[in-house]
Regions:
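Glycine/serine-rich phosphate-binding loop and adjoining beta1-alpha1 elements at the start
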Residues: 2, 60-128
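Residues that mark the start of a beta-strand
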Residues: 4-6, 29
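NAD(P)-binding Rossmann-fold cofactor-contacting core
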Residues: 26-42
């Protein structure tokens, strides 16, 4: 039996919403932020970033994580959020997953004490994309 883990899915497109639903179906508690235009079934949509991140074992950010203007890739959000503000809100030591992470974002994550994994750099995903 799977043990429930609290996860935060922040930003992204329909792929992130679908991922949130799959994680919920697998038995996890999932909170979403910046996915207002595509609510994820079974997940708790949160309008406050800090509330979304509270007690989250891991934070899952989109691929690509950042838009050209430095904002979080969140086309389904009702508001724009800078990637810096998002990274600054994640508690130090939290496992953070993101795709296509530029050096500046990785450096900010390290500076903030985050454990950041670029899932696009994983061979099994890179080959398929």
């Amino acid at each position: 039996m799977n043990q429930s883990t609290t996860l935060a899915v922040v930003g992204g497109d329909v792929r992130q919403a679908y991922l949130a639903e799959l994680l919920h179906e697998a038995g996890h508690t999932v909170r979403t932020f910046a996915l207002e235009r595509r609510p994820a079934a079974g997940c708790t949509a949160v309008s406050d970033l800090q509330a979304c991140l509270d007690d989250a074992r891991a934070v899952i950010l989109p691929m690509p994580v950042q838009m050209g203007d430095g904002s979080l890739n969140a086309p389904l959000a009702n508001a724009q959020h800078t990637i810096g503000d998002v990274l600054d809100a994640i508690p130090a030591g939290t496992l953070t997953l993101a795709g296509a992470v530029p050096f500046s974002v990785h450096a900010r994550a390290v500076q903030n004490g985050l454990t950041l994994i670029d899932y696009l750099s994983r061979e099994e995903l890179a080959i398929r994309n």
